[in-house]
Amino acid sequence: MVSTEIRVRYAETDAMGIAHHTAYLVWFEVGRTEYTRAMGLPYRQVEQSGTRLVVVEVSCRYHQPARYDEVLVVQTTVRVLTRATVTFAYEVRRQDDQTLLVEGSTVHAATDSGGHVKRIPEVVAASLTGTGRKTKG
Amino acid sequence: MVSTEIRVRYAETDAMGIAHHTAYLVWFEVGRTEYTRAMGLPYRQVEQSGTRLVVVEVSCRYHQPARYDEVLVVQTTVRVLTRATVTFAYEVRRQDDQTLLVEGSTVHAATDSGGHVKRIPEVVAASLTGTGRKTKG
Amino acid sequence: MVSTEIRVRYAETDAMGIAHHTAYLVWFEVGRTEYTRAMGLPYRQVEQSGTRLVVVEVSCRYHQPARYDEVLVVQTTVRVLTRATVTFAYEVRRQDDQTLLVEGSTVHAATDSGGHVKRIPEVVAASLTGTGRKTKG
Amino acid sequence: MVSTEIRVRYAETDAMGIAHHTAYLVWFEVGRTEYTRAMGLPYRQVEQSGTRLVVVEVSCRYHQPARYDEVLVVQTTVRVLTRATVTFAYEVRRQDDQTLLVEGSTVHAATDSGGHVKRIPEVVAASLTGTGRKTKG
């Protein structure tokens, strides 16, 4: 599990005075980026090597709202890995009292840069589950 | 079922050259706005009368990508209505060939303007299911 | 001058209860897209033919706020055209009372798809100023 | 001058493969938030005490693009302070080679929470220019 701090931006709030529900999906994406960096193979490099992890499913439950300037923590982990898909799970908490704000998950399919489905390359799969990193030790 | 046309904006695309997955949730929201207007009680008026329909759950499946300047159609309907929640369902299609791009649903809880959960007022419930409109006829 | 209708989305509002100031720049972009379509050479085709009009300057003055669900009109025109740049100007008005909300302009440089500055192709320049369309008549 | 680190999010890129030009204005806003925090009076508290600093003017020049996952530094300062307005200036640089990507400025008018123009309260003015902090020393 990889933790990433996020501070709610004014632009992310809406007329209800709280963070808009789409902001959490952007923060999940930031969480994924940091997860892959922590695992030793940043998503930027995954893309540069010709693999995209395209979002094919999103699911999200909102428990409590977040407000402008609050510091949140996104906890990101990989829950399922198949030949061609990976499922990330997320929890977003308010940092100061650890209240759980939102839980969610995203499923991604591997494609080449032309958008055609393919298997997840072994080096990517290994880094996503942390087995790649362990092997190095 | 209420249909709303959307044209993909450049700002909604990402470095994959396709509409970012969060754009669909914004389009769902546009679909809801138009659904409530078509049912005779625009969401703006619902809020002004002291009821908010806060997003508590989102789920979304992505089948095909959308690209800049394509015209899409969001079909919005109410699937479930309980005392305190309403569930909307959406389908997003490319207009020119009717390809199904994305399906999703959102669950909303009714709150007052202070964010406290409450029952959905009868006039709002009636308009959401169309029974309010029929009564007028 | 080309007019485009925009309805303010909930996602475009912020905690002040008004449209966030960045939303207008997105609407300018929508205005440009519709301007180029009205002139007979949609920006999508400009890009497909290998020319990008990259934003190099933005300037914007905000007079009055816009609110959720209001219908706005973006008026877009080309103010200056040089060999390698084009300047668009915009006015955003509230539709129902024609109040001027925001004025702005954007300067764009022509580049190839690799991002290298180049001259604006003659067919693009002609369509931007409407001289291309006139020639057809 | 207050420096703030920003990492470019995937959601902030567009189909050109670079950060969308509106992203910089959001980063300016983050820069302002951090500027006010560094000066001892976070903007959140300014708003809570009944003063809003509404954007009335934006201007921005784009020199070089930013890409997904790059770390940028936003340098924020107050350039002009009048009775009822404050002008912030910004420079955005790529962190690793200090290349200047974007320069900009925003002008803000003070209003009460109802949106009516007012003078900037003395405590806010002092914190914006740093004279408040110095006084404490």
Predicted segment positions?
Chain A
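Short structured motifs
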Residues: 56-62, 74-75, 88-89
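Short aromatic/hydrophobic contact patches that present stacked aromatics
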Residues: 7, 59, 107
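HotDog/MaoC-like acyl-thioester-processing domains
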Residues: 2-4, 37, 67-71, 78-137
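Short, well-ordered turn and helix-capping elements at secondary-structure junctions
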Residues: 10-12, 57-64, 96
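Hot-dog-fold acyl-thioester-processing enzymes
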Residues: 1-55, 113-137
